[in-house]
Amino acid sequence: MKKEHIFWTSICLLLGLVPAPVSSAAEEDEEFTNITDIKPPLQKPTHSFCAMKVDDGPCRAYIKRFFFNILTHQCEEFIYGGCEGNENRFESLEECKEKCARDYPKMTTKLTFQKGKPDFCFLEEDPGICRGYITRYFYNNQSKQCERFKYGGCLGNLNNFESLEECKNTCENPTSDFQVDDHRTQLNTVNNTLINQPTKAPRRWAFHGPSWCLPPADRGLCQANEIRFFYNAIIGKCRPFKYSGCGGNENNFTSKKACITACKKGFIPKSIKGGLIKTKRKKKKQPVKITYVETFVKKT
């Protein structure tokens, strides 16, 4: 009887020791899981003000400014009230990038126009943050048709077309390759608008650069007449336009050099079944009408 009691006592002691390794293993697994869930710290910016939150101030002006977003590592547009605020506020996109964004890897949008719809055709309708009332067209992915909407005049996204035909050609019935006609751009002296005159020579463009280089020039909503530059994605060149002083979009540069640096290197032109002859541009003294021409010829 005594031996039997000792035997069962030993069994109980052994069974009592079994859960200990199991719980230890669970703790080790739990500790390992916690370690893998830890996110690396954000990179510290060169200037402390680059990490400040956007501050439009207490006043009620409507001034376009730029700030550095520490979460996305990109310079973004905001509307400044005109007084107070903080140092994370820049007059131009280039100044913001120079002060805050140069220490971070460039985050670019890689777009390749191939067979099928471009990615931006699947974006939802976006009127932007401004208060304009401009008729535009977007591709509705639910109805599979291009539809009309009212655009505010600034920001928004690339699913935004000036004509129904342009929307249909791009998103409803895309061609095998996204082709853009070579254009002759003229400055209209009456209302300072850009008129594109297509020629017969098509070109293909492969874009590997920032998405803000793609929208057309946007004068904005105010009454000023500041000379700015925008990247014309149709002809692959930086062109001047008159900016009103507020609103507009990000395709807006204070100098031609800044425009070329940001956008021009992103486009790679390829001629179709022919050689490309680059014609020299002659500078004219008359600021009234500026014409730029590129000619295509077939190889013999």
UniProtKB/Swiss-Prot annotation:
Q: Pfam families under this entry?
A: Kunitz_BPTI (PF00014)
The answer on whether this UniProt entry bears the keyword Transferase reads no
Molecular function via GO: serine-type endopeptidase inhibitor activity
Function comment: Inhibits factor X (X(a)) directly and, in a Xa-dependent way, inhibits VIIa/tissue factor activity, presumably by forming a quaternary Xa/LACI/VIIa/TF complex. It possesses an antithrombotic action and also the ability to associate with lipoproteins in plasma.
According to the UniProt entry, where is the signal peptide?
Answer: 1-24
* Any single biological process term in GO: blood coagulation
Query: Domain named BPTI/Kunitz inhibitor: which ranges?
Result: 50-100, 121-171, 213-263
* Annotated site residues (Reactive bond) in this chain: R60, A61, R131, G132, Q223, A224
Q: Which GO terms describe its cellular component?
A: extracellular space
SS bond partners: C50-C100, C59-C83, C75-C96, C121-C171, C130-C154, C146-C167, C213-C263, C222-C246, C238-C259
**What species does this protein belong to?**
Oryctolagus cuniculus
Key words, A-Z: Blood coagulation, Disulfide bond, Glycoprotein, Hemostasis, Protease inhibitor, Repeat, Secreted, Serine protease inhibitor, Signal
Q: What is known of its domains?
A: This inhibitor contains three inhibitory domains. The first domain interacts with VIIa and TF, the second one with Xa.
Q: What is its main location?
A: secreted
Put simply, this protein is called Tissue factor pathway inhibitor
The answer on whether this UniProt entry bears the keyword Isomerase reads no
Glycosylated at which positions? N141, N191, N252
Localization, UniProt = Secreted
